[in-house]
Amino acid sequence: MNVPAALRYTKDHEWIQLLDDGATALVGITDFAQSELGDIVFVELKPAGTALKEHEIFGTVEAVKTVADLFAPVAGEILEVNAGLDSAETVNQDPYGSGWMVKMKLADPASVANLLDAAAYRELIGG
Amino acid sequence: MPFIVNTDADRESMLHATGVSSFDELIVDIPREVRLNKALELAPAADEMEVRSILESMAAANRSTADYVSFLGGGAYDHFLPSAIKAIVSRSEFYTAYTPYQAEVSQGTLQAIYEYQSLICRLYGMDVTNASMYDGATALAEAVLMAIGVNGRQKVVVAGKLHPWNSSVLKTYLEASDHSAVVQNVVEDGVGSIEVLKGLMDDTVAAVVVQQPNFYGCLEDVEAIGRLAHEHGALFIVSANPVSLGVLEAPGAYGADISVGEGQPLGSSQSFGGPYLGIFSVRQELVRKLPGRLVGMTKDSNGQDGFILTLQTREQHIRREKATSNICSNQALNALQAAVYLSLLGKQGLSEVAGQSLSRAHYLAGRIAAIPGFSIRYNAPFFNEFVVDTPIPPSEVVRKMLEKKVFAGCDLGEFGDEGLLVAVTEKRTKAQLDMFADALGELA
């Protein structure tokens, strides 16, 4: 299972990547999450401008037989949603790259450090 | 022959198996004050022959369209039903099937629903039709909830004259949502006023709803209404009588975003009010917000066509708390009847049914208008139904016509309105129409 060392993770299987400006971040779901869901057919995201508290739902990801909620790893505001997810299978193919879901402006960039690191997340998913 | 084999000895052994000594002990958790605390007042036991005889005599008291000439409409219509419909839908594979969750053993049912969806899409001119809903009224209410969910706005405007029972169901559905207000358009000469509608429109309107033909049978100016809805970013919801689409333009052709309808006229008998069929169609862009379920066609691993339930993830059995609709069961048997009916008639047959209903209704309206004391209330164009002003109260007309084995129509007094709503289908012969007009003439 692919768990990139440079990212931080939630127990709900989202990843977050702090960008170079130190104030914004990309959020998506992990390789483990996409493989558990199976064929992803639809991603529905709240629009840019939406303010999110930590753990607030910012969208849903729909697979053939189930739907999962997406939780904000930290508080912030949605700056941009990934328009490329009209082809939802992108999430299956490239969960850490072109399958990113939202770009957030973080309320407190330091809070990212409280999330799981790659080793802790790898332990959570048992591999 | 006992139907409930539940003797004292049976009860004793069941109580013993559950480890209690008496029935009272079994239900000890139910407070005494909410128990019945008296004997059930049931009629004495009867055997099957007696029960059958009682029920048959009760059924014989019904007066149905099998024995009476019917001009009843108001949402349920006495169209001709080809015998093949009953022969096909009463096959046990269809009659007993519940929701076809297991595609492997449900291909016939799934294909039937798929065919129904495809036929309704063509009839209504829409991209996607779901596997059906309870009835036309709940389909309309669900359409409004869907529109509110799509654009997040709160106000709903009804353009023209909606069936009062549909208004009532809509109100019931919206009462549970916090802020939605329904604004009813003023009706002038049988149809909604476009000028008044203009004044009601603003950017808080989630949806504009119109029934075509409307409750009075009149044809609303659906193109103008749809344009106004879209100019203000509202969704345009049309509730259309499916048979009328044999002669009228399809809702999809004049811009409907959601098309609904009562499917009873498509091959279902009136059945004293149900079960009926809720038709629900949308444009492709709205498919992800569609309530209910869809059947899709796909290929199996051998490359053969197969049918499956798809887009079911917004239904109760997968996400109960977030389902977009509380309607999970569909009306599969009625949908099948509609599919069989449409398949048997074809495009040409349906337009003949619609055309004959229309021309016979207009013939009757002409005859009634010529009777002194009677008049056709509205000047607006109509399909197969119209309001008559009568010289004696409509309830009297209805009662007197029953003596001649005629259902004269719907007394609008039952809806807090005035007049007699008369509907005509292709089943009414010229002799019946003349007989009805002559009989009305004797009342004047």
UniProtKB/Swiss-Prot annotation, chain A:
Domain annotation Lipoyl-binding: ranges: 24-105
GO biological process terms held by the UniProt record: glycine decarboxylation via glycine cleavage system
GO cellular component: cytoplasm; glycine cleavage complex
Record's keyword annotation contains Transmembrane: no
Keyword DNA damage: no
Signal sequence, start to end: none
Cofactor: (R)-lipoate
SUPFAM superfamilies assigned to the protein according to its UniProt record, in alphabetical order: Single hybrid motif
Entry superkingdom: Bacteria
Keyword field: Lipoyl
Annotated PROSITE patterns: BIOTINYL_LIPOYL (PS50968), LIPOYL (PS00189)
Cofactor descriptive note: Binds 1 lipoyl cofactor covalently.
Residue numbers of N6-lipoyllysine PTMs: 65
Function: The glycine cleavage system catalyzes the degradation of glycine. The H protein shuttles the methylamine group of glycine from the P protein to the T protein.
Subunit and partners: The glycine cleavage system is composed of four proteins: P, T, L and H.
HAMAP family hit by this protein: GcvH (MF_00272)
The protein's name: Glycine cleavage system H protein
Organism this protein belongs to: Chlorobium luteolum (strain DSM 273 / BCRC 81028 / 2530)
From Swiss-Prot, chain B:
Catalytic reaction equation(s): N(6)-[(R)-lipoyl]-L-lysyl-[glycine-cleavage complex H protein] + glycine + H(+) = N(6)-[(R)-S(8)-aminomethyldihydrolipoyl]-L-lysyl-[glycine-cleavage complex H protein] + CO2
Assembly, per entry: The glycine cleavage system is composed of four proteins: P, T, L and H. In this organism, the P 'protein' is a heterodimer of two subunits.
NCBIfam families, per the entry: PRK00451.1
Family affiliation: Belongs to the GcvP family. N-terminal subunit subfamily.
Organism: Chlorobium luteolum (strain DSM 273 / BCRC 81028 / 2530) (Pelodictyon luteolum)
InterPro entries, per database record: GcvPA, GDC-P_N, GDC_P, PyrdxlP-dep_Trfase, PyrdxlP-dep_Trfase_major, PyrdxlP-dep_Trfase_small
The protein's name: Probable glycine dehydrogenase (decarboxylating) subunit 1
Gene: gcvPA
Record GO biological process: glycine decarboxylation via glycine cleavage system; nucleoside metabolic process
Keywords: Oxidoreductase
Keyword Oxidoreductase among UniProt keywords: yes
Main EC class the enzyme belongs to: oxidoreductase
Superkingdom classification of source: Bacteria
